Amino acid sequence: MKEISCGRRTRVSFGKSREPLPIPDLVEIQKISYRRFLEEGLLEVLKKFSPIYSQATRSDLKKSDRGFALEFVSTRIGEPVVDPLECKAKGLTYSVPIYATARLTDMKSGEMKEEEVFLGYIPYMTDRGTFIINGAERVVVNQIVVSPGLYFSSEYIDREEYGGYFLPSRGAWLEVILDPYDGVLYAGLDGKKVNLFLFLKTIGYEKDEDILSLYPTYLDADDEDSLLLHVGSILLEDIYDGDRKIAEKWDILTKDLAERILMIDDINQIKIVHPIAQNTFEKMLELVSSSGEEGEEEEEKTKIYGLNEVTVVDAYLEIFRRLRPEELPRINAAKRYLHDLFFNPERYDLSEVGRYKVNERLRNAYIRYLIEVEGEDPEEARKKVYNETSLVLKPLDIVLASRILFDYFERRYVNDFEIDSYELKNLIRIFKEEYLEKRKTAPYDLRKLVSVFRRNYGVTSDLGVFAAIRYVSNINKELPSIPFDTKDHLGNKRVRTVGELVQREFERLFARAQKAIQERLTLINSLSKVSIQSLINIKSIISTVNQFFAMNQLSQFMDQVNPLSELTHKRRVSAVGPGGLRRESKVFEARNVHYSQYGRLCPIETPEGANIGFITSLAIYAKIDEYGFLMTPYRKVVNGKVTDEVVYLRANEEEEYKIIPATTPVDEEGNIIPERVVARMGEDIRLVPKEEVDFMDVSTKQPFSVSASLIPFLEHDDASRALMGSNMQRQAVPLLKTEAPLVGTGMEWEAAKNSGYVVLAEHDGIVKEVDAARVVVHRTDENGNLMYDDKGNPVVDEYRLLKFVRSNQDTMINQKPIVNEGDFVKKGDPIADGPATDMGELALGRNILVAFMPWEGYNYEDAILVSQELLEEDVFTSIHIEVYETQARETRLGPEEITADIPNVSKELLKNLDENGIIRVGAYVVSDYGVGSQAILVGKVTPKGEGDTTPEEKIIRSVFGERGRDVKDTSLRLPHGVEGRVIRVDVYDQNDIAELGAGVLKLVRVYVASRKTLDIGDKLAGRHGNKGVVSNILPKEDMPFLPDGTPVQMVLNPLGIPSRMNVGQILETHLGWLAKLTGKWFATPVFEGAKEDEILRPLYEERKKRGLHLGDDENNPNGKVVLRDGRTGEPFDNPVVVGYMYMLKLIHIAKEKIHARSTGPYSLIHQQPLGGKSHFGGQRLGEMEVWALEAYGAAHTLAEMLTIKSDDIKGRNEAYKAILKNMNIPEPGVPESFRVLIKELRGLALDVRLYDENGNEIDIDKY
């Protein structure tokens, strides 16, 4: 065990591995991305659209008298005008002004004019990686999407094809498809299949010789089967017998020629057109050429037929007919259409990352192309890389992609289609013995081939025939199978960070503004008379970008329950959102954990609902490269020795390496101890010699997110319970009295430090002043000497602390100093705690003495029995701050007035209001002073509409002025069920906030802090997914107690462990007790935590010293103790597991959920009570409840529930009057919902009428 420093505390760590890589800044992904957007991305967008020409210049430059061009040269970001705290208080957006230097050029004279123009305000990121939009803190979540690139998918197998597709960032998909039945290559254009060779003719390969030369294959000249199988193929080289040429390039391989070649010793191989390419060529001829050589099938051809018969024009027109059958084919329209589809940068964009992925995917195919087609030396060819830079498709991209299909075709067929082995053997025999001798069809025309076999040999399986062909032709090659690309592999997915998301939005909107700028350019007559600022009016763009922050699915209201929830939200990765997957998607593979996520995305932390697997969290060490691909670090291993060199690898780069876990034993020098070790390679786990190992994990925490790495003994918990533990830590309410866990993982300090709420020293120094609101540190130099400026004044850093700030979820953000005057602090040391932190460490809950035992049924269904001691000591007490606001508006009848002069209100309700009618700070307010009276926070009156005034009223008005006027009380009152202390009041008018809103004269916000103690129904949880609600609060003297008389503080259900398989909580309980007894703080890092014997033996020894060992076994310690019943003093039947567990109080507080209503608001349309606490609604009497009352025969109860208690307006008024007058309640009337039903049926043109039992029509409008 070793000691590690965690904030201002030292922990004893059980971790054994050395971690050479410090944990990075956990919020840097957000900060770096947005900084890059402001510094580079903004200018990239402006330059992409520069220069913008006037319309005259663009259409006719030479004839134009005055053509102008506008160009953006640089951008500049100003300083924020208002600080973040003021923005939150006033409901403003924290933003910065952006400026651009623009240059206007007269294209005719060459005269230029440069000017810096103001573009508008854009939201600015705070130091903590958040945005403040309209006063609310928000986070832009990272989005993970399939990367643009080239993919060969197994989805084509379902259509019994091989295929790949180019996926661009913007534009249409281009598919390359091989149909093994036809033996033809196709291009998928706009969802339609066309012959690939036709398409190649339109993109630069005009001659058939050029196209056929792209697809060579080599035959072994000594393999009789192979040669005979390829009779009819086109030769791609001259063939010599000694010095005599026996066949020329472009001749046909005949049976006679094949037999002759077999007899020549000097020929090792012959080069022919790949049979599929030849078949594609022949199908193209059939498609376009009207003439054919019918009746010549029986004759053996020796020369190629139809070479260059199909022209480029034919190709264009045939493709256009296929793609746009409703239009008349015209050559210019066809050219323009195809060009726009894949080769026009304005319509098609692969993006830089897409081009990188295409180049990477085509790298090996390019090397083979150089060797086979260009004839380069293999050694030289392997040194070359495919380095295309164009962001649109190039002809060679398509050729190389189609050549890759041959590899799938050659190597995978028998694997991909299930073929009966007996039938396959039979077919191979037929091929060898009979078919090769009698062959009459093209080598890969399956349709003809199958018909021959059906007719001659009685074979029915198409796939079997094809498999036999492939098997015979490859029988001596032993080619390895190649895998398909999968969208779920992280090598094929990239992360769009906040900067890229905003940049994409900005680019989309600027494309619209370009036209408006262009139109203004056409109106210019002279450079001297124009202001560039007047040309550029992109405020609408900026306002729409601001709208992106306010409305986009990926810009989310920040989860601010505690520092961990905020940190996790910033590191969240979402697969849903614009351009991503849909939540309703039934693609379960996309939700699964994929092996490529190791060290990049956490396999544990994800929501439990509809978003499971779609929303994930970044692993601790994960980084994002310039293309948006996730990388994870590894330590390099050389000859079985682990070095400290750290290498970051992308998911696809990792595939070929053997990687061992961080727990692998190594000696002091880094040499791996075992001779054979367990290593990962791709998705395989294998045992390899240590010399073959390439890399080692940098840490055992590497695969997990921050939340998951905060769970001690994670390795002993079932994954689904660990998921709940991760999620529930984010829901823990910051407590009044914080306490770090006795059993931590060492990550508590890192999480708190990166949350932004722990104040860290920016420089070394000595604390000069400390109070509740600030800390002043006198800086020191490297030698520890105090620093002074030129005038002899001390150089000090002043740290202002946040006091009683409300979070997004109404929890309290409060910072308090943890240093004393005179303390020396180093740079990076914590000097003040934030919410849910203790001595610089994350402290989400409290260490509680728990016992696992049943107690009078109060443990039923995971319920928790707690001691009154927890309330007395304020252990789970939390402060919640709610804000209430009201506006004084200008109405049609006059202005509303904020005043203490409210009609018909008791003095009791007005006693805490000041002379302006606003509650005083410090007042304690409760929601109910009496029946129906709620505390007034802001007194407000609204003018009432008046009819004709009587003479008496006119006299009163003249004597008392406006006080005699009739007003309505519209005061802001405290909602039901709330009580607390007013801690702050903000009053704003138009002078304070310019954008206060139309007709708003004054805005008042009242902040009320309420103290929530632990109560029955509150939800508590541990860190292992163990959760329950408080069932009862017992006096501490009734709680079970230890042999020394100490009562336990909480009783948990032991049945919650075996089936849930989260045994980590038991180990935590034992180690927690050991920590408490020894006064130490432990760190048990994930996957290298304390072992049982390291806990139970020392625990027994410590308990024995204190006489607490009763019930434990010295020879085989189990950590159990004999407890006694607090009520009787009798011992319980069996020893019980007792110890200290870290428990959290979650934000699901019973008091906030409980709600009751007698009468209240009704829905306008169907007149039924509203639903939910927020609307002061009633409980729904659903159909099942109606069935229950029907079954019970409670007719009268049912009648009044469906009418006067629900939506019978007349009936409920009559019932109210009857109750007041102490009379019998009258018969109920017609429910309003029935009237609505009748109206809807009449709206459907159905004449619905009502009749009574005597056949008389009832008018429901009068009833």
From Swiss-Prot:
InterPro entries: DNA-dir_RNA_pol_bsu_ext_1_sf, DNA-dir_RNA_pol_bsu_external_1, DNA-dir_RNA_pol_su2, DNA-dir_RNAP_su2_dom, DNA-dir_RNAP_su2_hyb_sf, RNA_pol_bsu_bac, RNA_pol_bsu_CS, RNA_pol_bsu_protrusion
Keyword terms of this UniProt record: DNA-directed RNA polymerase, Nucleotidyltransferase, Transcription, Transferase
GO CC aspect terms: DNA-directed RNA polymerase complex
Known EC number: 2.7.7.6
GO molecular function: DNA binding; DNA-directed RNA polymerase activity; ribonucleoside binding
GO biological process, one term: DNA-templated transcription
Gene3D superfamilies assigned to the protein according to its UniProt record, in alphabetical order: 2.40.50.100, 2.40.50.150, 3.90.1100.10, DNA-directed RNA polymerase, beta subunit, external 1 domain (2.30.150.10), DNA-directed RNA polymerase, subunit 2, domain 6 (2.40.270.10), RNA polymerase alpha subunit dimerisation domain (3.90.1800.10), RNA polymerase Rpb2, domain 2 (3.90.1110.10)
Pfam families, sorted: RNA_pol_Rpb2_1 (PF04563), RNA_pol_Rpb2_3 (PF04565), RNA_pol_Rpb2_45 (PF10385), RNA_pol_Rpb2_6 (PF00562), RNA_pol_Rpb2_7 (PF04560)
TM ranges: none
Enzyme class of the recorded protein, top EC level: transferase
Catalytic activity: RNA(n) + a ribonucleoside 5'-triphosphate = RNA(n+1) + diphosphate
Family: Belongs to the RNA polymerase beta chain family.
Function in brief: DNA-dependent RNA polymerase catalyzes the transcription of DNA into RNA using the four ribonucleoside triphosphates as substrates.
Subunit and interaction comment: The RNAP catalytic core consists of 2 alpha, 1 beta, 1 beta' and 1 omega subunit. When a sigma factor is associated with the core the holoenzyme is formed, which can initiate transcription.
Protein name: DNA-directed RNA polymerase subunit beta
Gene source species: Thermotoga sp. (strain RQ2)
